[in-house]
């Protein structure tokens, strides 16, 4: 009975507190890599868990929002056209953003569908995209 009362009070307090939108940083650990949709290096295809955890962002048809989790402080993004080659390699791609910190390009974000998180990384030597990965939200099963 005591546990039920505590649970009810907790639920009432949660309902009364103002709801703030949850940022992607708040849910940073709630996503796992579901599928690599493009990779130009064989080792990334083999390593299903290989990605740059510092570049995690959520994109939709109107904007690109992202959290840098301390490593990068001032990330800007620029919407760019998909090349013919990119459209062939990633046919699901609808919109592409280049991500920058100052003059340095960090990576790309590609919009493939609504409310899905994607990550990508650039090769530091030749500047080409290494992979684009689809992320899946982890849901807790009770």
Indicate residue ranges for each PLM-predicted region.
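Contiguous, well-ordered beta-strand patches that form the walls/edges
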Residues: 36-42, 59-113
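Positively charged n-region of N-terminal signal peptides that target proteins for export
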Residues: 1-4, 8
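Short, solvent-exposed coil/turn segments at beta-strand boundaries
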Residues: 55-64, 110-119, 137-141
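A glycine-biased structural micro-motif
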Residues: 26-29, 46, 52-56
């Amino acid at each position: 009975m005591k546990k039920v009362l505590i649970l009810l009070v907790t639920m009432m307090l949660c309902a009364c507190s103002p709801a703030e939108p949850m940022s992607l940083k708040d849910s940073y650990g709630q996503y796992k890599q579901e599928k690599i949709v493009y990779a130009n290096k064989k080792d990334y295809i083999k390593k299903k868990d290989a990605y740059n955890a510092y570049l995690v962002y959520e994109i939709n048809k109107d904007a690109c929002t992202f959290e840098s989790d301390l490593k990068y402080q001032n990330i800007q993004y620029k919407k760019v056209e998909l090349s013919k080659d990119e459209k062939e390699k990633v046919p699901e791609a609808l919109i592409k953003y280049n991500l920058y910190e100052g003059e340095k390009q960090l990576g790309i974000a590609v919009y493939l569908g609504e409310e899905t998180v994607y990550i990508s990384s650039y090769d530091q030597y030749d500047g080409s995209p290494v992979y684009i990965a689809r992320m899946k939200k982890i849901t807790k099963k009770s």
